[in-house]
Amino acid sequence: MRNLLIDIGNSFVKVALHEDRKVIKEFKFDDLKIDEIVNIMKKYKVVNSALSNVSNPNHELEIILKDQTSFFSFKNDVKIPINSPYSLKEVGDDRLALILAAHDEFPNDNVLVVDMGTCITYDLKSSSNEYKAGGISPGLKMRIKSISDGAFKLKEINPEYPKSYIASDTKSSLEIGVILGIQHEIKGFISEYR
């Protein structure tokens, strides 16, 4: 059976066709295109669908998915196989989906899930199947935008991975600060959570 997995994030809409526990095709859109999703459903004969949405709710899409597929919603349908002191009503669908995937793949292990999107999120699943929410920090684009918005002479850049810790110009200074800053942040969280 073919499954359609839809992730409506803050920056992109990601769609994946899933069959036999494998992703067989992926699509990425800058914004929600319901007609494209309907075309994908028809072309690939989708039977089941799941929606993760951390952006504005789209009831039209949910109605279509409920009408044309066996529809799964994280907020309404999920039976959480893990315990949590954190209020799961506050957890975004994206974080919930990732922690459930970590539970499915590594049920007896401690797992740190790092998701790099609009924001960077850190979530833990213990070997005793307890969910422990970690931090949320600005993602790459958000960091670059906040620098350019807050500093008159620093413009937005399209960053590349720095070749060195020593800058040769303003662009490379921003790349070092932002990209290597994220890298060290992640290493720091990994170290703290060990």
What are these regions (language model features)?
Residues 37-38, 81-85, 143-148:
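Short, charged, surface-exposed secondary-structure boundary motifs
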Residues 98-107, 132-174:
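Glycine-rich phosphate-binding loop plus the immediately following alpha-helix
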Residues 71-81, 118, 155-161:
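Acidic-glycine-rich active-site phosphate/pyrophosphate-binding loop
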Residues 81-111:
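Conserved phosphate-binding catalytic cores of ATP/NTP-utilizing and phosphoryl-transfer enzymes
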Residues 43-92, 128-132, 137-140, 168-183:
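Short beta-strand-loop/turn "lid" adjacent to the catalytic site in phosphate-handling enzymes
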Residues 27, 163-194:
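Adenine-nucleotide phosphate-binding core of ATP-dependent small-molecule kinases
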Residues 2-67:
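Conserved phosphate-binding loops in N-terminal lobes of ATP-dependent enzymes
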Residues 1-24, 102, 108-131, 147:
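Gly/Thr-rich phosphate-binding beta-strand-loop-beta motif of the actin/hexokinase/Hsp70
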